[in-house]
Amino acid sequence: MARLRLTIAYKGTDLHGWQVQEHATRPRPRTVQGVLEPIVSRMAGEQVRLHAAGRTDAGVHADGQVAHVDIPDHKLDVDWQKAINAQLPDDICILDVRRAADDFHARFDALGKRYTYRLWLTRRFIPPKLHGQVWATGPLDVYAMDRAARHLAGTHDFAAFQNQGTDVTSTVRTVHAIRRCPSGTLPAGALLTYGEPYTSWRCTGTHPDQPPATAGHPLAGIGLELVWSFEGDGFLKQMVRNMMGLLVAVGRGALAADDVPGIMATLDRSRAPATAPACGLTLSEVYYPPCDYPYAR
């Protein structure tokens, strides 16, 4: 048998997450694993199982999900990327297929992951191409959110940010970096990294959290998109969405940035704000050795 490593992208809007739901009543919910495995099994000539780096929830997207699968040696000459993509629906795509070491494991060999979360800072309307891919929050105090994010970065017990339904032995995780990034339509500049200086962009409106006043700006009078990036050695169940829910609560003024350490110290999920919607979250990248991941031990 030979092991393949697949890099996968998908739009999660109409998907019930990664993992096949074998015990669900028929018709089974549509999942990424449930779509891919029958295709790969037919091509391999036998039943196969895909193992992913992370089991994304229903509605969550991916630009860089990684999975491994074992196939017969005599199937190595197949153009797996082309052949799988020819059979996939429009919301799932294989970005890369390569042979991996026989002991490679998509989940256990990962050095870290990067998730991104997209916010849309108005509720007046969402451009059609962003439907199901952003959380429309309305205006936010992004500078208060910056201050709150400083408390989340680093090594902490994140029990207050873990939802039920997991069997992990430890809730201590390291968030290496939290970045407030420019989207493709925003000025460059915003960066917040744990332990490093950062800068923030400003809009040209009357208030830094309002849409730009410049008539030629592509978002003038409409709203702003903010993209937050979270890098860490691993994340608990819905941890990124729970951190994003906290940051938005701070941005709305429901909490102060200085409330964050106290909430974390309780280790109590009920003390933290509600989970952010799945629609804004994307698994953007999974890091493996050898690579230039700056936080690798």
Curated annotation (Swiss-Prot):
<dbReference type="InterPro" id="IPR020095">
    <property type="entry name" value="PsdUridine_synth_TruA_C"/>
</dbReference>
<feature type="binding site">
    <location>
        <position position="115"/>
    </location>
    <ligand>
        <name>substrate</name>
    </ligand>
</feature>
<comment type="function">
    <text>Formation of pseudouridine at positions 38, 39 and 40 in the anticodon stem and loop of transfer RNAs.</text>
</comment>
<keyword id="KW-0413">Isomerase</keyword>
<dbReference type="InterPro" id="IPR020097">
    <property type="entry name" value="PsdUridine_synth_TruA_a/b_dom"/>
</dbReference>
<comment type="subunit">
    <text>Homodimer.</text>
</comment>
<keyword id="KW-0819">tRNA processing</keyword>
<dbReference type="Pfam" id="PF01416">
    <property type="entry name" value="PseudoU_synth_1"/>
</dbReference>
<dbReference type="GO" id="GO:0003723">
    <property type="term" value="F:RNA binding"/>
</dbReference>
<dbReference type="InterPro" id="IPR020094">
    <property type="entry name" value="TruA/RsuA/RluB/E/F_N"/>
</dbReference>
<dbReference type="InterPro" id="IPR001406">
    <property type="entry name" value="PsdUridine_synth_TruA"/>
</dbReference>
<feature type="active site" description="Nucleophile">
    <location>
        <position position="57"/>
    </location>
</feature>
<protein>
    <recommendedName>
        <fullName>tRNA pseudouridine synthase A</fullName>
        <ecNumber>5.4.99.12</ecNumber>
    </recommendedName>
</protein>
<dbReference type="GO" id="GO:0031119">
    <property type="term" value="P:tRNA pseudouridine synthesis"/>
</dbReference>
<comment type="similarity">
    <text>Belongs to the tRNA pseudouridine synthase TruA family.</text>
</comment>
<dbReference type="InterPro" id="IPR020103">
    <property type="entry name" value="PsdUridine_synth_cat_dom_sf"/>
</dbReference>
<dbReference type="GO" id="GO:0160147">
    <property type="term" value="F:tRNA pseudouridine(38-40) synthase activity"/>
</dbReference>
